[in-house]
Regions:
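Residue-level recognition of single "structural anchor" positions
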Residues: 1-329
């Protein structure tokens, strides 16, 4: 827009009625979202300015895409590309709304349900679900966490879930040919009065939680509760000069003995939870509470997606922002 046209536009704002002001504000917010996501995508191109087809870094500007992103033409092979070419988000038609979905996922407030977010964005719930899974696939790749000093370790548990498997539907439709699934649905224990399994069972999935006093944290789903599995998961995390604090589980004692690491066992009853004034596992207990609060609104995510949800929580705790996800895509 030319400068004199822009001044006329600003002068005309004083003639708007309240309804028109609301419409103008909504339009400006939409434009601001689009501008922000375009800036992040183009920043990604400036960091990696080589052609995704031939790898040559000689290019020239070649117009803009339908979504307003700068397009380039390779001066070597003649192919055109933009900041989204070859990225995970290359086929998203509304990158501005995708940025809103990322802010909902990684903001300070509790993430909204897929249905609530879809209503806000005016999209189908399955579109929002696919976007969420796409974002989780981007942030699931993490760097190795380095621990030092006093290291706390414990486990928390998550119910096994087959959400979306349709196995009970197929069984009810053809009970003669489709066998009954190995576990009743969790709702059947309440609605049909089935007796709940006491204590820990094979349907309780262990999640290893590790934290040190420097702020390093790790949540990792384990395939089972065997001591050997715990040892394999803990061994690469423990430096030689660390002090391991845990409960009395056998796996931790073996890890400490194998690595020659000092091991302090703390109790679970009042008066035994802190040893020598500084040895405790309150940091991982706090991590368990954060995990429970985070996972509760999802009503038990499918086990096949549990690792993605764990990484989602780690990303929120680490302060990863929406723009970091777009640049990493």
């Amino acid at each position: 827009m030319r400068q004199h046209d822009f001044r006329r536009f600003l002068n005309a704002l004083g003639d708007l009625n309240p309804a028109q002001i609301e419409q103008a504000q909504t339009k400006i917010m939409d434009l601001r979202r689009k501008t922000e996501v375009i800036s992040e995508i183009e920043a990604r191109t400036n960091q990696e300015n080589s052609c995704p087809s031939c790898g040559i870094d000689r290019r020239q500007k070649w117009g803009r895409t339908r979504t307003g992103i700068q397009r380039y033409r390779c001066q070597s092979c003649g192919k055109t590309y933009s900041g989204r070419t070859g990225s995970v988000i290359s086929r998203i038609h509304r990158p501005d709304l995708f940025l809103v979905a990322l802010r909902d996922m990684l903001g300070t407030s509790t993430p909204r349900s897929v249905r609530a977010l879809a209503r806000q964005l005016g999209l189908n719930k399955y579109t929002v679900w696919r976007w969420r899974m796409l974002a989780l696939s981007i942030i699931q790749h993490r760097e190795a966490t380095a621990f030092s000093g006093i290291i706390e370790a414990d486990e928390t548990y998550q119910r096994e879930s087959r959400k979306g498997s349709r196995e009970w539907v197929r069984h009810f439709a053809d009970p003669q040919n489709v066998p009954q699934p190995p576990r009743p649905r969790w709702e059947d224990f309440t609605t049909k009065g089935l007796k709940m399994m006491r204590g820990l069972s094979k349907w309780q999935l262990p999640i290893l939680t590790v934290a040190d006093r420097g702020g390093a944290r790790l949540l990792q789903r384990l395939p089972n509760r065997q001591s050997a599995t715990l040892e394999r998961a803990m061994e690469p995390l423990m430096p030689k000069d660390a002090v391991l604090c845990s409960d009395g589980a056998n796996g931790y004692a073996t890890v400490a003995a194998t690595g020659g690491i000092e091991h302090v066992v703390v109790g679970t009853k009042p008066g035994t939870r802190v040893t020598a004034g500084c040895y405790h596992i309150q940091n991982v207990n706090s991590l368990h509470a954060r995990y429970d609060k985070f996972i509760k609104p999802f009503c038990g995510p499918a086990t096949k997606n549990l690792n993605l949800y764990i990484r989602w929580l780690e990303a929120r705790l680490a302060g990863i922002g929406p723009t970091d996800v777009i640049r990493a895509s």
